[in-house]
Amino acid sequence: MNEKFVINIGRQLGSGGRAIGEKLAAEFGISFYDKELIQIASKESGLGKEFFEKVDEKESHSFFGGLLGLRANVNSEIYGNNYLCNETFFKIQSDVIRELAEKEPCVFVGRCADYILRENPRCVNVFITANTDDRIKRIAQSHELSLEKAQTVIEKMDKKRAEYYNFYSNKVWGAAESYHLCINSSVLGIDETVAFIRRFIEQKLG
């Protein structure tokens, strides 16, 4: 494929989504961006890296934040500052994603990249899921946690990712209609899932 294109990967924690994204980038010989976006956004904005790390893919708030479980007696000044930080972060990161997509073919993991690049016809949006037991085992092993703790971490992170995505995209995180392809990596395994997605991308983009 000679034209620039972008692969956007949404994923459940423990599904192998990041590994799949990295392998796709390697196979296509294109750039891969996940946490790397934080460093780029920090450099381009002049804001500290810790600012971006603090709000990266966390649940977002608005003045209608009661929908996310915020109480009415939250201090308005603090609440407003949190809102500003989240909105500023999202805008800066969105600008970086658009600039990178314009400059080169690449893979983005998370960060609402599929929504940010929704006007780009050369995008393929993929969501990676996996069986719950496989996810728990993968996180327990990679982070040296008990199975019980790994399950708790997965539930909390999935909730945060869903809130972040749903808030900014006005779509539903993980829902089939939000993506071009949803795939369970437990069915084929990581490497065969990569091969399947690659064939799908080549077929879609031609």
Feature roles, as predicted:
Residues 119-142, 147-155:
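Conserved phosphate-donor/acceptor-positioning beta-strand/loop module used by diverse small-molecule
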